[in-house]
């Protein structure tokens, strides 16, 4: 009698964040089904957990229209080859991790071949290009969503979706220790501390750094002991920021950090940051914040017409109200930013309300996401 085939899960991750999610999912599945086989497109973390890589994740990790066009033939070849090989393999479940432009079409191809498909991490369909929800519904058996309002959106369109909580909320403590973080960064316990996070992309650092630095200068007039920490994601962004600082605020003393964004948030009394994942991380660090964002005028004009949400930052979207001040475009200027930050640095009622609400929101999305994702995969595999 032939031996029964082990549970076979196919996965495709397209960038580092997806590799981290994939590794967590594989770990949770291996704990329950030790002989399971994992195969697909994987980064180093997924491979370390035992995923067989037919292609390296770097092949898919291209950013920007020009770069994608330059690699389009190769990307289309990889997708066609994966469709053929997964169809022959017939895995119990296929999991496309993020990378929606690549994965959702692949999921649709495999679903037509009778393979069960999951899309892990909802694209921002609730915010813009909402019609994508119909393609997602046709292509997948299940979407795994990090945030409760994402599930509510899919429910409106009868697309199967499971809210699993956010892996970042699982990884960060409910009550982080501010003094420990200050010790790591060399910040006195009794000083006022402000974190500036002007973004991870070159365009963001270019558009925001000058206004953020001028804001810090204004705040130091009110708080002469103000410590300013600036975590930058890599050497390129650091060099870019240093050039702008030399021009705008050469005498402003700041702590420049390589990475360490999370430590900077935990250590600070307030943060001024670009929108994006940083705002969610700052909420989970329980650091009161102001969101400042600026883009090229035409891009902003277009975004205003395409984006369907009332708020841009995840804390506000989760709270369903303006919990965090958002100052966009012309509003994102030093005087207004400083006025919004002053009450947060005072560590009074505004800060305490924000802190307590951040903690409640953290609890709402802290659901052991790796285990929940594994549950969804195993239920679909049956």
From Swiss-Prot:
Superkingdom of origin organism: Bacteria
Record pathway: Glycolipid biosynthesis; lipid IV(A) biosynthesis; lipid IV(A) from (3R)-3-hydroxytetradecanoyl-[acyl-carrier-protein] and UDP-N-acetyl-alpha-D-glucosamine: step 5/6
Catalytic activity entry: 2-N,3-O-bis[(3R)-3-hydroxytetradecanoyl]-alpha-D-glucosaminyl 1-phosphate + UDP-2-N,3-O-bis[(3R)-3-hydroxytetradecanoyl]-alpha-D-glucosamine = lipid A disaccharide (E. coli) + UDP + H(+); a lipid X + a UDP-2-N,3-O-bis[(3R)-3-hydroxyacyl]-alpha-D-glucosamine = a lipid A disaccharide + UDP + H(+)
Keyword Methyltransferase carried by entry: no
Pfam families (alphabetical): LpxB (PF02684)
EC numbers on record: 2.4.1.182
UniProt cross-references to PANTHER family, sorted A to Z: LIPID-A-DISACCHARIDE SYNTHASE, LIPID-A-DISACCHARIDE SYNTHASE, MITOCHONDRIAL-RELATED
Family according to the record: Belongs to the LpxB family.
Function noted in UniProt: Condensation of UDP-2,3-diacylglucosamine and 2,3-diacylglucosamine-1-phosphate to form lipid A disaccharide, a precursor of lipid A, a phosphorylated glycolipid that anchors the lipopolysaccharide to the outer membrane of the cell.
Name of the molecule in the record: Lipid-A-disaccharide synthase
Lineage, opening ranks: Bacteria, Pseudomonadati, Pseudomonadota, Gammaproteobacteria, Enterobacterales
């Amino acid at each position: 009698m032939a031996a029964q085939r082990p549970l076979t899960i196919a996965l495709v991750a397209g960038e580092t964040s997806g590799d981290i999610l994939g590794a967590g999912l594989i770990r949770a599945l291996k704990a329950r089904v030790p002989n399971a086989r994992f195969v697909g497109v994987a980064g180093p973390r997924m491979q370390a957990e035992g995923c067989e890589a037919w292609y390296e994740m770097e092949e898919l990790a291209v950013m920007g229209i020009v770069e994608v066009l330059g690699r389009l033939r190769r990307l289309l070849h990889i997708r066609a080859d994966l469709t053929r090989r997964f169809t022959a393999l017939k895995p119990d479940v296929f999991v496309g991790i993020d990378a929606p432009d690549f994965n959702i079409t692949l999921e649709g191809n495999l679903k037509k071949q009778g393979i069960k498909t999951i899309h892990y991490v909802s694209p921002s369909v609730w915010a813009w290009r909402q019609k994508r929800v119909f393609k997602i519904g046709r292509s997948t058996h299940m979407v795994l969503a990090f945030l409760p309002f994402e599930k509510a959106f899919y429910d409106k369109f009868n697309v199967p979706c499971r809210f699993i909580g956010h892996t970042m909320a699982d990884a960060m403590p409910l009550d982080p220790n501010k003094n420990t973080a200050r010790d790591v960064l060399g910040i006195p316990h009794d000083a006022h501390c402000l974190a500036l996070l002007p973004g991870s992309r070159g365009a963001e650092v270019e558009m925001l750094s000058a206004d953020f630095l001028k804001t810090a200068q204004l705040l130091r007039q009110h708080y002469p002991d103000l410590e300013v920490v600036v975590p930058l994601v890599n050497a390129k962004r650091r060099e870019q920021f240093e050039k702008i600082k030399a021009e705008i605020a050469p005498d402003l003393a700041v702590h420049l950090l390589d990475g360490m964004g999370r430590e900077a948030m935990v250590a600070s009394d307030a943060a001024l940051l670009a929108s994006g994942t940083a705002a969610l991380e700052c909420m989970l660090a329980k650091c009161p914040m102001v969101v400042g964002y600026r883009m090229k005028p035409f891009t902003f004009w277009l975004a205003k017409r395409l984006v369907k949400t009332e708020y841009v930052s995840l804390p506000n979207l989760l709270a369903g109200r303006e919990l965090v001040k958002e100052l966009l475009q012309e509003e994102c200027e030093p005087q207004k930013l400083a006025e919004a930050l002053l009450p947060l640095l005072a560590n009074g009622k505004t800060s305490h309300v924000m802190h307590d609400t951040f903690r409640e929101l953290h609890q709402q999305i802290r659901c052991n996401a790796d285990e929940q994702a594994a549950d969804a995969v195993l239920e679909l595999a049956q």
